[in-house]
């Protein structure tokens, strides 16, 4: 029916449009805060889960949850309210996660990579991978040329979007480590190994 169902509570329009719409500012901000906190909470849970299988020490779990929550809610905000494409929002979230991992890693004496990797995993675009393979199966199983072309187009679009999102997340997470190598690689110096 032509509607966009990205958000359920607040209309998915840029913030400027919402503020001009005549709605109460407090209601808009409370709904937005609720959505951001909900998104951050689910990303934090996923970040801790991925951190546990990445063999992070238990003392790093709260920081991994914090980094994952901030990064994912930033991407959610940029996509739904700042009208930024998911690729550029993923780059911004990757940069944020990378920077937070570098500077938090110093305080808890953990490598930035060990904090950023589990925090990035909740943002891997699973829906694009699913749609890629769904349309690949449609391409293989159809005999109609127009259906094949349409399915191939959708498969290519989803594949490219998913791959570019993953690349942007990786680039965004690596840039702060490369910009601050002394800080990033010095976080684990003077740690006795057991």
Language-model features: locations:
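Cytoplasmic-side transmembrane-helix entry/capping segments in multi-pass membrane proteins
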Residues: 59-69, 87-93, 113-122
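C-terminal membrane-adjacent module
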Residues: 132-194
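Short juxtamembrane and helix-loop transition motifs at transmembrane-helix boundaries
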Residues: 25-31, 45-58, 73-84, 152-153
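Short helix-perturbing small/polar motifs within transmembrane alpha-helices
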Residues: 75-80, 94-110, 116-122, 126-127
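Hydrophobic, membrane-facing alpha-helical anchors
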Residues: 33-50, 67-74, 171
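Structural signature of hydrophobic alpha-helical transmembrane segments
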Residues: 29-42, 84-95
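C-terminal ends of transmembrane helices
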Residues: 45-56, 99-111, 177-182
């Amino acid at each position: 029916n032509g509607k966009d169902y990205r958000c359920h509570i607040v209309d998915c329009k840029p913030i400027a449009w919402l503020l001009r719409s005549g709605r109460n500012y407090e209601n808009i901000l409370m709904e937005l805060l609720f959505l951001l906190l909900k998104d951050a909470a689910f990303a934090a849970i996923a970040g801790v889960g991925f951190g546990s299988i990445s063999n992070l020490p238990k003392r790093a779990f709260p920081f991994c949850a914090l980094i994952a929550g901030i990064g994912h809610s930033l991407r959610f905000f940029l996509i739904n309210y700042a009208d930024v494409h998911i690729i550029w929002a993923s780059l911004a979230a990757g940069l944020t996660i990378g920077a937070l991992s570098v500077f938090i890693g110093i305080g808890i004496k953990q490598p930035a990579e060990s904090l950023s990797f589990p925090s990035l995993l909740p943002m891997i675009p699973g829906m694009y991978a699913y749609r890629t393979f769904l349309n690949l199966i449609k391409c293989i199983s159809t005999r109609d040329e127009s259906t094949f072309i349409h399915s191939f187009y959708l498969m290519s679009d989803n594949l490219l979007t998913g791959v570019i999102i993953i690349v942007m997340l990786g680039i965004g997470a690596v840039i702060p480590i490369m910009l601050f190598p002394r800080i990033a690689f010095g976080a684990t110096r003077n740690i006795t190994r057991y």
